[in-house]
């Protein structure tokens, strides 16, 4: 096979993403799909939601915001902390044939682990080792790993991108677990040189204020939003909230908006020359505690913070406001001192044209606005799909659609019989965008049977239908006219070979219920 054809086939293969349901994962999934990258996701079902529902709710939110129908990833139901990530042999076979790289993003932000049989060790260290073993099992050598800038632990000064183990201490088990996981990734003998992303503290969306988790900066914002409104305003409308903070207020904090982090990682992931490097994804302009306080002052019309720096405060006279505030931020007290400086040479080389949004007063107010609307994570989520699954009946393969059929067919291939007239041989890909869509590879060898497997064809010359599922269902009659406007890799004169077989097959396999 020529280098050109190898490269072409590589572009048609899938990227396996872990952690797609987390904050950064939601944005990585969006940006990869918008970039036209074929994505498979490893997702764990919950007691209340199937894996398809979990991913569907994320994509429905993006579609409402972007006002565009997105492609659907191939969804693999599994568990990161289980052997082979909880995947079946058939799923592993599919990855072996269809996946070219892994973007391991999943992690748990737990600061204290009771023992190594619990979090954060189970996911951050054990889960990463399971992903490495899965790469060996499937023959994937291109691993992209989302670490954290804080594998540097308690180090000060300039932190080099290629530095890791210099005998540093750590503030908590989260930092140590991510350090150990990155060590495993770097030492893995069956990978090419891994690409490692080390984001700083991740905050919400710079444009909308959205977040799905309230850690880091949001812990402080939520606490302020809870405590300050309890204090009655004086005759001038000002709330006096006396509190002494053991800092100067000018200590730099490396905080980065999640949408920028995802945009940068997507750029680096798709830049061949960036492979094998380590990247500190940290801000152009650090945030300071004084800025956060002043921005919150202006939002809540309050005042009262005193910066004590290294001067010990007299704790005999502590206001109720101060006592409650300090008690609630104890887990982050180890971060009161200045952040180190993260070397960004590699980052600037490959993505220096993507500036990091500065967290200014307007953006911090946007974060506060979103937190208030979201009731700081307590608002009931209403993510009803545009097209309810009860309105659609499909025999195209889905992980939870027919467990017995999948057990007998090995998940990767399902045979569909049609009661219509015999079909001529054909091979197509279905890329059905929008609510409850998906990606499939359909092959008919003649007669009344066709084989369907998840994922798009890996051959560049196989025609692929790109269309929203709702549009396909609502316009069957229109689709009997020339279909080339909906297809990739198909010329108008080719329509007659598979137009009617396709529509005939879809009428049998995908219909609206009455």
Where in the sequence are the language-model features?
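Amphipathic terminal alpha-helices
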Residues: 14, 31, 40-43, 341-398
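A hydrophobic C-terminal alpha-helical subdomain
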Residues: 227-235, 240-245, 312-355
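N-terminal Rossmann/SDR dinucleotide-binding element
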Residues: 1-101, 105-108
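Conserved Rossmann-fold NAD(P)-dependent oxidoreductase catalytic core, especially the SDR/UDP-sugar
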Residues: 101-108, 112-118, 122, 126-176, ...
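NAD(P)-dependent short-chain dehydrogenase/reductase
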Residues: 157-158, 187-196, 200-253, 258-263, ...
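Mid/C-terminal beta-alpha module of Rossmann-like enzyme folds, strongest
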Residues: 264-331, 371-385, 432-435
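Feature captures hydrophobic
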Residues: 377-514
């Amino acid at each position: 096979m020529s280098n050109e054809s190898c490269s072409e086939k590589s572009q048609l293969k899938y990227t396996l993403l872990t952690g797609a349901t987390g904050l950064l994962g939601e944005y990585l999934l969006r940006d990869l799909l918008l970039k036209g990258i074929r994505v498979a996701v490893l997702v764990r079902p919950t007691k209340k939601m199937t894996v398809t529902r979990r991913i569907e709710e994320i994509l429905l939110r993006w579609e409402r915001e972007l006002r565009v129908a997105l492609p659907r990833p191939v969804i693999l139901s599994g568990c990161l902390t289980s052997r082979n990530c909880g995947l079946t042999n058939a799923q592993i076979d599919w990855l072996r044939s269809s996946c070219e790289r892994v973007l391991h993003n999943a992690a748990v932000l737990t600061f204290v682990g009771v023992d190594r049989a619990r979090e954060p060790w189970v996911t951050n260290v054990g889960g990463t080792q399971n992903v490495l073993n899965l790469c060996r099992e499937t023959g994937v050598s291109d691993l992209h790993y989302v670490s954290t800038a804080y594998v540097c632990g308690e180090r000060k000064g300039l932190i080099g991108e290629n530095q890791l183990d210099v005998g540093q201490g750590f503030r908590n088990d989260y930092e140590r677990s991510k350090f150990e996981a990155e060590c495993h990734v770097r030492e893995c003998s069956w990978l090419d040189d891994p690409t490692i992303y080390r984001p700083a503290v991740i905050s919400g969306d710079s444009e909308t204020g959205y977040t799905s988790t309230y850690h880091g900066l949001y812990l402080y914002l939520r606490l302020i939003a809870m405590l300050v409104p309890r204090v009655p305003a004086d005759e001038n409308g000002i709330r006096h909230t006396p509190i002494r903070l053991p800092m100067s207020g000018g200590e730099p904090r490396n905080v980065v908006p999640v949408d920028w982090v995802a945009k940068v990682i997507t750029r680096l992931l798709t830049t061949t020359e960036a492979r094998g490097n380590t990247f500190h994804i940290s801000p152009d302009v650090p945030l300071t505690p004084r800025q956060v306080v002043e921005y919150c002052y202006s939002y809540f019309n309050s005042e009262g913070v005193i910066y004590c720096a290294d001067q010990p405060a007299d704790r005999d006279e502590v206001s109720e406001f101060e006592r409650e505030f300090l008690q609630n931020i104890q887990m982050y007290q180890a971060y009161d001192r200045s952040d180190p400086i993260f070397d960004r040479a590699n980052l600037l080389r490959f993505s220096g044209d993507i500036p990091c949004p500065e967290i200014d007063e307007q953006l911090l107010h946007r974060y506060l606005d979103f937190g208030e609307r979201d009731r700081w994570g307590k608002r009931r989520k209403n993510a009803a799909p545009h097209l309810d699954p009860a309105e659609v009946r499909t025999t195209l393969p889905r992980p939870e659609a027919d467990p017995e059929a999948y057990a007998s067919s090995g998940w990767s291939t399902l045979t569909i019989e049609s009661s219509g007239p015999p079909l001529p041989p054909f091979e197509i890909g279905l890329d059905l965008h929008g609510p409850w869509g998906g990606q499939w590879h359909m092959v008919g060898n003649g007669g009344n049977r066709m084989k369907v497997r998840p994922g798009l064809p890996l051959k560049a010359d196989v025609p692929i239908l790109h269309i929203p599922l709702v549009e396909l269902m609502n316009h069957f009659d229109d689709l009997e006219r020339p279909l080339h406007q909906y297809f990739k890799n198909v010329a108008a004169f080719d329509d007659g070979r598979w137009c009617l077989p396709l529509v005939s097959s879809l009428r049998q396999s995908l219909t609206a219920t009455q």
